[in-house]
């Protein structure tokens, strides 16, 4: 047995203390479920009967979790060096006397920083910030696009600002190398989320690299594939879905009769609390997609706190029923980074890779700035 050194003892004690602290910010049913230990079962995917997927809006990994211990955040030893000779965190800024701007804390305890303005996440601006992988143009890109709000690109929150999000990350599983699908805005990323496609060849209504739907899309979606396979599914949304149900632009859903299974599963709206009721009473389908309301989406300038309330309500309902908790996987991710800085260079396809470029040669397949994702319950 390895010797229990003082350092290892302190590390273990610190981890235990952090877990205890984090649990205080989780809803009551989740705390109870965690205290009960892992559910009995085979420990394999055979135990999973329900998958619940929630895609929130517009936050980058560093913006939320740059200060989280144990992940590739601000202490990342592999952070790249810019052509200036400085770390990627020293973003060039010609308007700053120092010549650079470092990530800075958005203190929500003494300011209104829960409600920061949204910065541009248009395809062209995102690619300008990325600068062909040099990762050195965040300030010029956002000062040009956002004016006086441009520096918000470098702002971040810490544990005191977003305690619930930190509690999830420390109690479950967080992936620090997850990237969204397109270096651009909501629509292309949510289309990949629901269909793995934005029609790069332009044969079925695409290619989609902006938040527009000039024609109805005709390619096949994941929900339709589930229907063909005999797998039950449901989109849970309210009347206010913030335009985040990207089944709506598809011809198959637009033309579906109101009483049809396709419309009822993909387009109908529910009163607040319907998912919570179905989860607590073990009435969930095999796959559920949750769609946030506008103010609970976490899209700036909506608040992380309102998003925390939305997420907490969902996982608390799952944990209310031990049988449901034991057989449910909950996946939380974010569609894109808004215009918020992240230091990790996204993976990109080689030039000429099939289905990664639209007809004009504009690249569409590059992953966006790194997003936090996957809190698995």
Where are these regions (language model features)?
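N-terminal pro-sequences and low-complexity stem/linker regions of secreted or lumenal proteins
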Residues: 2-372
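Hydrophobic alpha-helical segments, chiefly the membrane-spanning helices
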Residues: 373-377
